[in-house]
């Protein structure tokens, strides 16, 4: 009787371990946002042109330029700059 209980326990344990292996672990993944800045638009256009046709000469490799490539503007420096006076008043 003890051997039967051991076999049942091992089967249940095996099923439980297989279930744990098959269950994906939830992780905090950052979702990629659609970028609408000029840099990202330029990258998308370059990638489109590279992949759309090769009739324009040499195949250029796709660019990997994102909105964080050039960094963020420092708001303090922007506020300290003198205003540009294009039109004399």
From Swiss-Prot:
Instruction: Output this protein's name.
Output: Islet amyloid polypeptide
- Propeptide residues according to the Swiss-Prot or TrEMBL record: 23-31, 74-89
Q: Cite the InterPro entries for this sequence.
A: Calcitonin-like, Calcitonin/adrenomedullin, Calcitonin_CS, Calcitonin_peptide-like, IAPP
Organism lineage reads as:
Eukaryota, Metazoa, Chordata, Craniata, Vertebrata
Q: Which residues form the signal peptide?
A: 1-22
> What keywords would UniProt list here?
Amidation, Amyloid, Cleavage on pair of basic residues, Disulfide bond, Hormone, Secreted, Signal
Domain of life (superkingdom): Eukaryota
Gene from which the chain derives: IAPP
GO biological process terms, alphabetically, are: amylin receptor 1 signaling pathway; amylin receptor 2 signaling pathway; amylin receptor 3 signaling pathway; amylin receptor signaling pathway; apoptotic process; bone resorption; cell-cell signaling; eating behavior
Family from the record: Belongs to the calcitonin family.
Q: What is known of its domains?
A: The mature protein is largely unstructured in the absence of a cognate ligand, and has a strong tendency to form fibrillar aggregates. Homodimerization may be the first step of amyloid formation.
According to its UniProt record, how is this protein modified after translation? Amyloid fibrils are degraded by insulin-degrading enzyme IDE.
Assembly, in brief, is: Can form homodimers. Interacts with IDE and INS. Interaction with INS inhibits homodimerization and fibril formation.
């Amino acid at each position: 009787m003890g051997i039967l209980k051991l076999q049942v326990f091992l089967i249940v344990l095996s099923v439980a371990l297989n279930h744990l292996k098959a269950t994906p672990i939830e992780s905090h993944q950052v979702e990629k946002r659609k970028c609408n800045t000029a840099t990202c638009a330029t990258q998308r256009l370059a990638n489109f042109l590279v992949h759309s046709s090769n009739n324009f000469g040499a195949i250029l490799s796709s660019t990997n330029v994102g909105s964080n490539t050039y960094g963020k503007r420092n708001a303090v420096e922007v506020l300290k700059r003198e205003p540009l006076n294009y039109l004399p008043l």
